[in-house]
Every structure is written in structure tokens, then in C-alpha cells.
Amino acid sequence: MLFRSMHNDAYAGASHGPDVGFIVPVFHEDALIAFATTTAHHLDIGALTPGSCGIVDAIDAYAEGLQFKAIKVYEQGQKVVPVWHLLRDNIRVSDLVVGDMEAQIAAARFGAEQLGELINRYGLTTFAAACGAVMNYAERLMRQAIAALPDGRYSATTYIDGYLDDPDPARRNLPLVVTINVEGDEMTVDLTGTTPQVSDRPINMPLEGTVDIAIWLTVRSVLLDTDTHGHIPVHDGLVRPIHISAPKGCLADPVFPAPTIARFCPGNQLADTVMKALAEVAPQQVSAGI
């Protein structure tokens, strides 16, 4: 655990700027085995306005606060002091925020230590086999659930608020379009037809970290509901049969530096739209909304 990194890049898997992740590597006999990570929503990240979600005037990603692309905050077991100076000098209520960040690192370190002890106890071979088995198990469950649906294409559209005072109706109501293609034990969720990105409002949804999560969550909740199927491990294996595509530059796959801090608002509507599409083929399994 010689280094620890910080990451909040919305265009590289993080959800949005205030959700900061701290990553601690897990080594076994000098080989990198895994990462232990904590993520927390922080009170401030040095954005245009105070707070963490009310940045409605953000016209680009730079106005949404400091951006960290997996930068090291510890190196060789020691703090990278300039990074911590940068945090304290550019974040409001920095004592509180930086203290929370230190707590995150401590939690991630604890997780890394516990995982290391687990590997030492059972051995790397057994650990790797168990990881593969649990991922394959979840994949089988999802494939079985998808295969139980009739092959076909199922679509739905939802409109979200855009520029409400604009004379052009196409800019007042922005479509989110979902087409689900079921073929055998695999599913493709296509977002073609979704409105283009909004370059000066923070409602864009990065494909990785927002759109994919909204889709995976909804499909899992419909096809493998916990009340019906019991506990199902949630990880990469579960979503292997689900493929997602979206036109580059649309609201669901924006191009940097389009602002994204309010991505959860259209993200919830996207999840509802996936639910509506699945209602065509699994009406008894959907809810009234997310």
C-alpha cells in the first residue's frame, strides 16, 4: 500500500465531481491483485458556487469544481504534500472536507488490509478461483433471466425539461429514447434518438458511471428482484450479458467539457424509461417507476 490515489473524473467512470473516490492497491507477494476503494459525496469541491449539487449555473465541467484523474495523494507511504495544499486552498470548509477525505483513505486502507488477510489465509489460487466462480454465477443468473424473455425489440421514450422559455418546442422538451433488443441470453440497450448534449446546463450523463449504472440497476431490479430471487452478488459478472450503446455527443454520452453535476436528474428519468420499455415484455415484474 505504498500509494493511494484520488479520482472524481466524471468522464472516466466517476459519477460526478463531488463524489470523490480514494483507491488503495492490494498486493500479494509484490503482485498487484486488487484495489480497495471508498467513494463519498463531499460538501464542496471548489466549484463555481458553494455546495455540491446546486451548481445550476455551471456552463462547463471546469465550473463544477476540481477534477482529479486518479492522481496520487500518497507516494511511498508519505503524503504528496502539494496535492493536499491544493485541496485546502481551493475547497470551501476545507477542514471538514479534507478530514472526510482522510477518513475515506483510512477506510480504504482497512479494506485493503482485510482483503490481504483473506488472501493470505486461503491462498491466491483459491481467492482467484472464488472471484471467478462468484462472477460466473451472477452472469448465469442474468443470462437465464434474459433468455426467459421473448426475443424482440422493446422501446420507450421520456421527455425531460430543457429550455422552457425557448420558442422551439424541440428545445423545451428533450427526449430520452430507449430501445431494448433481446436476443437469446443477451440484451442490448440502444439510446439512439436521445437528445443531443446540452452544452451549458449540467444535466448531461456520462455513459460510464451514470448511464450504465442506471440501466444495470433497472434491468437487475426487474429481472432479478431480490424478493423473488434472494441475494445476488452485484459486480461485473452480473452485467456481462447487457450491452449499451449511445451516439457520441448525445445527452447520454456527452463530449467533455459538457457539465454533468446534475446527471442524476435525467439519470432517474432514463431508469424510468428502461422500466417502461421492459413493461412491454415483463409487465408483471416492473414497478410504477424507479
Cite the ranges covered by each PLM segment.
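Structured core elements
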Residues: 5-6, 23-25, 34-37, 67, ...
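Short, small/polar residue-rich loop motifs at catalytic or cofactor-binding pockets
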Residues: 18-21
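Mobile "lid/hinge" segments at catalytic clefts and subdomain interfaces of large enzymes
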Residues: 27-116, 274, 278-282, 286
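Accessory "access/gating" subregions that flank catalytic or transport cores
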Residues: 113-196
